[in-house]
Amino acid sequence: MARKPKFDPTGRAAKLFAALLALCVWQLAAVLIHNRLLLVGPVQVARRVIELLGEKTTWEALGFTFGRISLGFFLAFLAALVLAALSARFPWAETLLRPYILAVQTVPVASFIVIALLWLSSRRISAFIAFLMVLPVLYANALQGIREADPQLLEMARVFRLSGLRRVRCIILPSLAPYLKSACHVALGLCWKAGVAAEVMAVANRSVGGMLYDAKVYLEISDLFAWTVLLVAVSILFEKAFLWLLDLCVNRAIRWEG
């Protein structure tokens, strides 16, 4: 007798059910509260999202925020790789960097935003804060990934006089990649949260953070939720695209014969 397929609690069907259940709970809460100044339902939010997508200012705000935050992330990504390589090669470099990394990890993001407002214009602050918040995460994981490279393979590479590039490509990169990908999962979400928070506090014009601030001031709760939905959608798409590109580059670098 054929066994019935078991329900997979982590499968797509389960995830879809959980999402639909969350929407139902959201709609029920909106109906029970019955106050649009406190909570609006998903139907109203979806309608407002569609309206916003038809407005030019929406795309300008999304483009501005995406450009600034992605710039901050990419700069932090490159800086983390360089600093991790230096720290792995020279112990004194890690010692010198440690106070700065600890400071960024422990000081509240709001403090950095307020300080940055004294140094930078409101339209540049999101890139700076995104860079600052994700750098320690990327640096720590990149350093750990480099140090996890097999020492026996590195010694063999030294004996056979492999070039530095081949050592990096064939030994260090396969060890580094999982740590880097894990760090990017965390950092990509963190940079959007911190960057948009900076825009809200700085009241940056024509940015997602600025739109969220305006929605709060004018009690446009539908706009507040709609901009949040758009922000989440853009951040998810950016994360998926970057991780796909990272996997592609790593795999091609490892397989490359040169």
Question: What positions do the PLM features span?
Answer:
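Non-cytoplasmic
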Residues: 183-233, 243
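Generic hydrophobic transmembrane alpha-helix motif, especially the helices
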Residues: 102-137, 144-145
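Transmembrane alpha-helical segments of polytopic membrane transport and secretion proteins
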Residues: 1-20, 240-258
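Transmembrane alpha-helices
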Residues: 128, 132, 165-198, 226, ...
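Short cytoplasmic-facing helical segments at TM-TM junctions of multi-pass membrane proteins
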Residues: 141-180, 212
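C-terminal transmembrane helix and the adjacent membrane-cytosol boundary/short C-terminal tail
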Residues: 91, 182, 225-258
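Transmembrane-helix boundary motif in ABC transporter permease subunits
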Residues: 71-101, 114
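Periplasmic/extracellular loop-to-transmembrane helix junction in inner-membrane transport proteins
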Residues: 6, 32-74
